């Protein structure tokens, strides 16, 4: 549908990365200060890793690793706290968050990594790089498809879990 966003195989219009989504470094939150009984997800470079009772960002966004784990991209549609090991979207310019998450996965931000010991991703290295510019209508169509696939995956997973429970019950009946 969109083609390779690095090579722009569909010859789509392009713009600077920062015009599609502006990223910023996350915020410090020491482990001892986290309120694990909170309902706000805390995102680090490797995804949601804790909970807290205060959000630093309202309304959802896209998160990727800045230090350590580079290249994985996550999104949330709710409030969250991005840690200092991550970069998060401070301005999506009205673009769809789900679309942006998949776009950034395919854009391969790890290409811009620096450092040998602990890899680091500096937003200034890619903010002015060209990236495809896709209409909001196409983004929304794509996001609806992703949501439907995720909903189907969840239904299949639930069915598998129910089958596993049934199997255990039958095994208990046969061998118990």
Predicted regions mapped to residue ranges:
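A short beta-sheet element
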Residues: 44-48, 52-107, 114-127
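Exposed boundary/loop context
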Residues: 19, 31, 37, 58, ...
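Short amphipathic alpha-helical coupling segments at ligand-binding clamshell hinges
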Residues: 99-103, 138-141, 145
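Short, flexible segments with low predicted structural confidence
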Residues: 28, 35, 71-72, 112-114, ...
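Non-catalytic DNA-recognition/assembly elements of restriction-modification systems
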Residues: 1-44, 128, 133-140, 147-176
